[in-house]
Amino acid sequence: QFDLYHSLDNNFVGSDKLFANDYGAVLCADDVNKYYRGPERFSICLKDVNGNPIVGENVIININGVDYKKVSDDKGTASLAINLDSGEYLAKVSYNGRFGSDSKKANVKVYETISGNDIVKMFRNETQFYAKFIDSSGNPLAKRAVTFNINGVFYTRNTDDSGYAKLNINLRPGTYILTAYNPVNN
């Protein structure tokens, strides 16, 4: 609180009380860990310095080099669906509006839903290709049909209880690219 004294004509001195409130915007953004095509979203909050939501303000979320403009809702929150390939990304959130400015950084990690290792096979030996399949929540994809493509030929195999599928490899010597398809998220 400040006491403000003023005079307009040197004969009369007036006084008023001036109240100064804290001013500023505070962003919050948490790290996100999700599986490919999972339902999790990148969420932010925008509040004033007293923790009250700031409503209807533009917030910029930059992820993977792309800016997304979101508007804070009645709770001061906004979110962005994460539809990125598996990998690690840095999300930068910024606000510059009527309530000041703030910025935050958060990490977004998208996990694979298929895992397998390169193999080296000697012609006609017993080495085979195995891959593990999981759903978008990280649970094994048990007893499901999955598809492999190698050398332009598609093969359908069923996973076991742990989400593993095996593909027998019987090809001439050479280098091949094998593509596995998860039926849950393509």
Predicted features by range, described:
Residues R41, G56-I60, E88, Q128, ...:
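Exposed beta-strand and adjacent loop surfaces of beta-rich binding modules
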Residues K47-D67, I134-F154:
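Short flexible loop/turn segments that cap and initiate beta-strands
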